């Protein structure tokens, strides 16, 4: 049982870490775009040169640099489009790899070993329908009321792998949501401004007539 549990935990860790692996591979592909790096370096060099020359005194050179900049900018945009297309192809390939190596085997393993007992709980600690759910999994919700599945005799109730995984994933998801809420950037409070129309109307209010003695 321990070996199967370790295999399932390994699949679970890989499934949770896969978005990070996906992101790292995409960043690696973007960082290793040699042509884009060269084009960006050339553009920075020309921009630095443009700041040091005068458009009036060195008009020919200044115009030539501008044309070169336009050409480089177009090449940069084309290279970015090709890079995005490459990233999309990489994403599609990674999805197929994940489906074959993680999703399908993990799903089959969960169905195949879903009823495997993980640990025992004292009987009577939870209501009877929960104990049946722990022991038989989700099938107890349908078969329990028909008395087809019953809680076993004895002083303890086993917790099946399917229910244990469900509880574990819920805990991991909740902790992830808490972490995201704690690390999310604070949203600044909206500034309250007075409507200029209201200010104009207030300034144009006629004076109040004072009583004449």
UniProtKB/Swiss-Prot annotation:
Required for the post-translational delivery of tail-anchored (TA) proteins to the endoplasmic reticulum. Together with GET2, acts as a membrane receptor for soluble GET3, which recognizes and selectively binds the transmembrane domain of TA proteins in the cytosol. The GET complex cooperates with the HDEL receptor ERD2 to mediate the ATP-dependent retrieval of resident ER proteins that contain a C-terminal H-D-E-L retention signal from the Golgi to the ER. It comes from Kluyveromyces lactis (strain ATCC 8585 / CBS 2359 / DSM 70799 / NBRC 1267 / NRRL Y-1140 / WM37) (Yeast). This is Golgi to ER traffic protein 1. InterPro entries: Get1, Get1_fungi, Helix_hairpin_bin_sf. Residues 55-99 form a coiled coil. GO terms for biological process: tail-anchored membrane protein insertion into ER membrane; vesicle-mediated transport. The chain crosses the membrane at residues 5-25, 99-119, 159-175. Keywords: Coiled coil, Endoplasmic reticulum, ER-Golgi transport, Golgi apparatus, Membrane, Transmembrane, Transmembrane helix, Transport.
């Amino acid at each position: 049982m321990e070996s199967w549990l370790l295999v399932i935990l390994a699949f679970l860790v890989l499934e949770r870490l896969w978005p990070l692996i996906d992101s790292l591979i995409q960043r690696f592909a973007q960082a290793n775009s040699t042509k884009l790096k060269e084009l960006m370096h050339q553009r920075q060099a020309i921009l630095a040169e443009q700041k040091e020359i005068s458009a009036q005194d060195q008009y020919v050179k200044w115009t030539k640099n501008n044309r070169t900049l336009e050409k480089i900018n177009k090449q940069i945009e084309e290279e970015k489009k090709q890079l995005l297309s490459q990233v999309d192809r990489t994403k599609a390939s990674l999805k197929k790899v994940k489906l074959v190596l993680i999703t399908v085997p993990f799903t089959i393993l969960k169905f195949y070993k879903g009823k495997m007992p993980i640990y025992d709980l004292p009987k009577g600690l939870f209501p009877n329908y929960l104990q049946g759910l722990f022991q038989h999994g989700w099938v107890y919700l349908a078969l329990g009321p028909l008395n087809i599945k019953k809680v076993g005799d004895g002083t303890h109730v086993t917790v099946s792998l399917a229910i244990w995984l469900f509880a574990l994933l819920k805990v991991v998801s909740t902790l992830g949501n808490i972490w995201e809420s704690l690390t999310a950037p604070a949203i600044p409070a909206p500034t309250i401004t007075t409507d200029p129309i209201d200010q104009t109307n207030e300034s144009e209010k006629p004076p109040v007539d004072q009583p004449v003695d």
